[in-house]
Amino acid sequence: MSDILLGSYKTRLKNLRFITFFVLARSYLSAPYNGMQNRAYAFILITLMIDAIGIGLVFPIMPDLMDRVGASSTGEGALWGGVLMASYAGALFIFAPIIGSLSDAYGRKPVLLMALFILAVDYVVMALATEFWVLLIGRIFAGIAGATYTTATAYIADISSPEKRAARFGMVGAAFGIGFVLGPAIGGIAAELHITAPFWIAAVLSAANVLFGLFVLPESLEPRKRRPFWFSDINPFTAIIGAFKTPGLAIPLICLFVFEFANMVYPVLWAFFTRELFDWSSFTIGISLAGYGILLAGVQGGLMPVFINRVGEFRTLQIGILSALIGFIGFGLISTVTGLILVLIFAALSDLSPPMITAMAANKVDEDKQGLVQGVIASLASIAAFLAPLIMTGVFEVFVDEDGIYLPGAPFLISGVLIALLIPLVWRLRSHAQS
C-alpha cells in the first residue's frame, strides 16, 4: 500500500514543483512594479506557503507525537491532540486582530519578520519537546505567529494597484493550497527518518525565510499612513455581533459556522482515526492527506465552475451538502480501506458548499462591507476550529475505549447529524442564490 502511495505521490510532487515554480516565477516576472516589489511579493507568497506547511505537517505525526509525550492510548492521544489544535486556533483567533493592528501602527516588515522568527524558534522547541505542556506552549506561540496572515494580505494590498489586487489575492489562495498539500506530505515522509524531523525542516524553512526577508522585503506602509494602536480595534466579537444583526446575513453565517465545525473532524481526527482502524503509519497518513488536498483542489478549481454553469449556485450547494452527509455517514460506518477511498470522493465534493454560502453572504451587503463580512466569516471559522477539536476528540476517546461501545467513526456521525440539521436552513438560502 505504501509503495503504491509513494509512486503516486512522486508523480504529484513533480506537478506541485512545477506549480510552485510557476507561482514564484510569475510573482517575479509579471507584476508591473519594480524588481524589489516583485521580490517582496514572492516573499509574502513563500511566507504564507510556509505557514500552511507548518499547519499541515503536524497532522500526520500527531499520533506518534502524542505517544512520545506519554499518551497511553489512541483515544487519550487524540484528546491531547485536540487540546493542541484548539490552543493553536484559539491563539490565532485572539491574536489575528492584534497582529493586524500592530502592523498598522508600526509597519508590516517588523511584524512579519518577528512572527517568522518566533515560528522558527517554536519549531525547534517542538522538536525538542518531550513533555505535553511544552508542546502546548509551542502550539500557542505557533498560533500567535500564524496570525500574520492578516499582515501578509495587508502588505499585498499596500504594494498592489486596485486592478491587480484580486489576481494577487488569488495567488495567495494558490500559495496556501500548495502549502496544505506539501505540509502533510513533508510531515509523513520526514517522520520516516525521525518523529522530530518535520519540525527541524519547518524550522530551517522559517529561518531561511527570515534571512530572505531581511534583504528583499521593503516596508510597504509609509509612516504618514500609519495609525495608533487602539485596543478597541482588536475585539473580534464586536464585528460578529454586528454582522448577525444585518438583515439576511444571519442564516448564511450560521450555515458556514456549522459546516466549518462539522468539517473540522477531518483534520482533527484523520490521523488517529486511520491509525485506530487500519494501523497506518505517519507516512501513509501524510500521503493520504496530501492526496485529499489535491482532490479538494480539483473540486474547487475544476468541478465547481462546471457545476455553477450547468446547474446554478443553489443546486451546487445542494450537491455539496448531500455529499457532506454521505461522506460523514460513510466515514462513521466504514471498516475497509476500499470503503474509505470511495467515501473520500463524497467528502471532497462536500467542499462545493462553503464557497456558495460565502457568495450568498457577500450578496447581502454593500461593497464597503465586504471586508467586514469576510473577516467575520474567518472569525467564525476560527471559533469552530477552537471548539471542534475539544468536542470531537472527546467523543473519539469515549468510543474507542475498550470498556464501552467501540465506534471510532462516532465523531463523523455527529458531524453528519449537524449537516442533517442544517438542511432546513440551507433550503431557506434559495432566495440568496443567483442561478
How would you describe each model-predicted region?
Residues 83-99, 290-303:
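Central cavity-lining transmembrane alpha-helices of secondary-active solute carriers
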Residues 138-177:
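Cytoplasmic helix-loop-helix junction between adjacent transmembrane helices
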Residues 314-357:
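C-terminal transmembrane helical hairpin of 12-TM major facilitator-type secondary transporters
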Residues 210-216, 413-435:
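Multi-pass alpha-helical transporter architecture, strongest
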Residues 218-255:
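Juxtamembrane intracellular "pre-TM" segments in multi-pass secondary transporters
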Residues 93-130:
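Conserved MFS/SLC helix-loop-helix module at the cytosolic interface between two early adjacent transmembrane helices
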Residues 191-204, 394-417:
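A membrane-interface helix-boundary motif in multi-pass transporters
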Residues 61-78, 268-285:
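Short amphipathic helix-loop junctions that connect adjacent transmembrane helices
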